[in-house]
Amino acid sequence: MHQGTCHCGAVKLTLPSKPEVATACNCSLCRRIGGPWVYFEFGTVQIEGHPENTLEYIQGDKTLRTVRCRTCGCVTHWEPLEPKPGAKHGVHLGNFDPELIASVIVRKFDGANSWKFFDELPSTNESPPQGEA
């Protein structure tokens, strides 16, 4: 198991397995938060210190809450407001050891416009779009 924490240690995350692939998204929220996300089946990530040490942000279509530590402010994860079968937890990989981060392949995702991975889009010489999705 792989464990990580927010900066102050008030929120601890334990992953059920080593992630192989992470996603770097350019949507209006993720590009501000920065860092890659890894995904696991909802309920399989152990989270200590939540909700007592966290604050949440709910925006847009009001289906997800983005969670951060109330002390140090580090974003730790997101979770569905109403988990359904097949729901996922998004975990911010920046809260884990650099060795784990370096071992994970990061795919860039166009959450601002096409809702596809950039490596699946037609090749162009233009810079990736930076919309306000």
Give residue spans per PLM region.
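A short Gly-Trp-Pro
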Residues: 1-5, 10-133
